[in-house]
Amino acid sequence: LFPYTTLFRSRAEVADVANAIYDGTDAIMLSGETAAGKYPVDALKMMADIAEMTEPHLDYKVFIEHRSMDGREKISSAVALATVRTAKNLKANAIVTPTMSGNTARLISNFRPKVPIYAITPNSTIQHKLQLIWGVTPLKGYQRDTTDHIMSQAMNVVRSRHLIHKGDLVVFTAGDPATNMTNGRGAVTNMMHVIEAE
């Protein structure tokens, strides 16, 4: 985003970074020229400072009220939106989602919940990709199994890392392996549970 020949930033460059944040971008990055230029560390620090100064001014209600649901994935998007609204209404401590593809965590992130999103996946590649998604903490764990076992395994992962504690309210969402194939379109996120951590 920044030119590499000067330490000073123009108003347009600052606005580009701020607008990316206002647009809900999950990650921003420097161009190759900047990263290899005279001041790569200073440019990165400046970009991070702009992002950190911009984020507190976002109206997160806008993300819930005005983000449209993905047309290809209306069922999953509707469940993701319901998950975020439920977490807000109940003042939940976290959202937990076991995921094979990372899609559920990405959909939930689109609505910018104020609670952490813990995405539990057995797939290392998906875990690494989810590190770039806003608000998502990807964790390794769980194996394909019945819905009850997947929920139990995912809760054990977040509990063992002390991310949730006894009495915390957790909104749990995933695709139920027994019922999540819809009209030949593949797996969808189709369930949500509210659980009090034991």
Model region roles, listed by residue range:
Residues 20, 108, 170:
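Conserved, mostly hydrophobic/aromatic
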Residues 34-56, 185-195:
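C-terminal helical cap(s) of enzyme catalytic domains, especially alpha/beta-barrels
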